[in-house]
Amino acid sequence: LGDVYKRQLTGVFEMRNNESSENYLETILILSKKLPVVRSVDIANELGFKKSSVSIAMKNLREKNNITVSDAGFITLTESGRQIAEMIYERHELLSECLEKLGVDKEIAAEDACRIEHVISPESFEAIKKHIHKS
């Protein structure tokens, strides 16, 4: 039982860590559409996090080759980082829209979409996408 529990905890940690990374990448994408340059302080302000927490996350994203950080501290998505961010952003937008069409309050729909976007399978998302676009 101990090993199974440890594996489950590890899986949950990895999933949450991945979700966190995806949220940061999505935030960088959104900010890059609004601002001329994106810095750690912009991300911290947008998410309401401490700059130190964001700095740790940026280090991790840089090590995964999802972002580059210039000497001036400007953060840019790499091609792989942009692909992940755009996938998450598309999921978020479509799932929010779907939930709102079902009568869910806009704020609740956005919060729920933010949770669902990280765990939904590609197959389920594509099925929802096809259904929404038929309507």
Identify the function of each model-found stretch.
Residues S52, E107:
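Key DNA-contact positions within bacterial/archaeal DNA-binding proteins
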Residues T10-V12, E111-S135:
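C-terminal regulatory/oligomerization modules of transcriptional regulators
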Residues L1-Y5:
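Short, small-residue-biased leader/transition segments that mark boundaries at the very start
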Residues G73-R91:
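Basic, amphipathic "hinge/linker" alpha-helix immediately C-terminal to the N-terminal HTH DNA-binding motif
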Residues N65:
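Glycine-centered, phosphate/nucleic-acid-interacting loop/turn motifs that mediate DNA/RNA or nucleotide
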Residues R16-F49:
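N-terminal helix-turn-helix DNA-binding core of bacterial DNA-binding proteins
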